[in-house]
């Protein structure tokens, strides 16, 4: 076991805050319409250029263990904001740094950290209520486009394409993003489906940055029962390996030896594979698997009809252009099912809806109908170079997530204005002691930081702008950093999803509270000299089954 380095009190917190400052300084430059780009060296290929706060945060690891602990805590705030709301990562970073740094000064001055935290929690909950009150539902395509434009750093085309995609497949519809083979940026609606089952093992992940498994042009095996032993599947697995195409297995479950064997072969590169549980339960599960079979032009392997895994050939497997599997969902894009068969299945489901008397059954049938007939909108992002395409694709994905958040919880005035005006409600809060009051005042000051940073990135004085905005009673009155003018933010179309604002504040306060209440820090002591990794021999040939290992 490695020896540990232990630090206590203000020294530990101060070093953690140095790490927080390093990460926050790199991330904060991306905030707002005039935020700057950050260039990140990649382990291979061209450097990555991004204006996405969470991408910058994820790329940072510090050599000093204690500083790195602080940086990783701050990174967790940005990552959580991105996961929950898809945007607000830079705002979360700026807020967390302000709360942690000023909070630590108060602790050093003798304030009780637990009472400071209580004051902060009360203030944050009050601001969240103010954000909820200020929130306004969005309905029009124009408003959806505005959210997409803001979240993609002012790219109007991205906002308009997202709005068009939502119009095509509905606000709850499935929308995916992929790289185009040319310069254009298009929306295409294809046959596809999403269901709420994720990968059975994280070892199936192919894109570790986004933690998703991406299978291009895969075969799809649909098996009605549980898979616990792969022996009956060896002939079909061998055929898939020979074809050099990936395989998606959808079954009631894949467990024990079968799952372990698939994982081993996936890691060794013998078989590009992923496995997910089938959606639904009981008879409904079988019906949904039959829907997937029709959508992908495959067969549901069911023993009730005398079908056995040993006899399955490639002809029985479904096909799709692409499958993307996250921790919670599977999206099948452009299944190769026959249009006529899909239409017949849709009519069959519609007749079941008309016949059923159960509200529950009707709801579940309507869900199946929507999945089968709704299709998938694909946003195809093009550009002149690979670097440009990847950077724009990142922005499209962020904007899409933020737009979904806006549809879910509504929008508020953007540009940091909502948090700034909400902070004024904190001045009337009554608390038990001066330490809790200091916690409230800490939040009031920190809520000025996002708008200050937006303004400073645009080359103006943030403090002056904040002072002017606070003189106004209108809560939508703000500063348009793009045109350098004071405007009504809602009328000007400068809006943020309420969910993004809420999540950024919650995650920032959570991380800052952890830092100011930390008294002891334990990390691995750095080694005097690094031991070189022993050279490994080649993997050697994996006998049998074309490189597979069973």
From Swiss-Prot:
Its EC number is 5.6.1.7. Forms a cylinder of 14 subunits composed of two heptameric rings stacked back-to-back. Interacts with the co-chaperonin GroES. One of its GO terms (biological process) is protein refolding. Together with its co-chaperonin GroES, plays an essential role in assisting protein folding. The GroEL-GroES system forms a nano-cage that allows encapsulation of the non-native substrate proteins and provides a physical environment optimized to promote and accelerate protein folding. NCBIfam families: GroEL, PRK00013.1, PRK12849.1, PRK12850.1, PRK12851.1. Belongs to the chaperonin (HSP60) family. It comes from Rickettsia bellii (strain OSU 85-389). Keywords: ATP-binding, Chaperone, Cytoplasm, Isomerase, Nucleotide-binding. InterPro entries: Chaperonin_Cpn60_CS (IPR018370), Cpn60/GroEL (IPR001844), Cpn60/GroEL/TCP-1 (IPR002423), GroEL-like_apical_dom_sf (IPR027409), GROEL-like_equatorial_sf (IPR027413), TCP-1-like_intermed_sf (IPR027410). One of its GO terms (cellular component) is cytoplasm. It comes from the Bacteria. One of its GO terms (molecular function) is ATP-dependent protein folding chaperone. Gene3D superfamilies: GroEL, GroEL-like equatorial domain, TCP-1-like chaperonin intermediate domain. This is Chaperonin GroEL. Pfam families: Cpn60_TCP1.
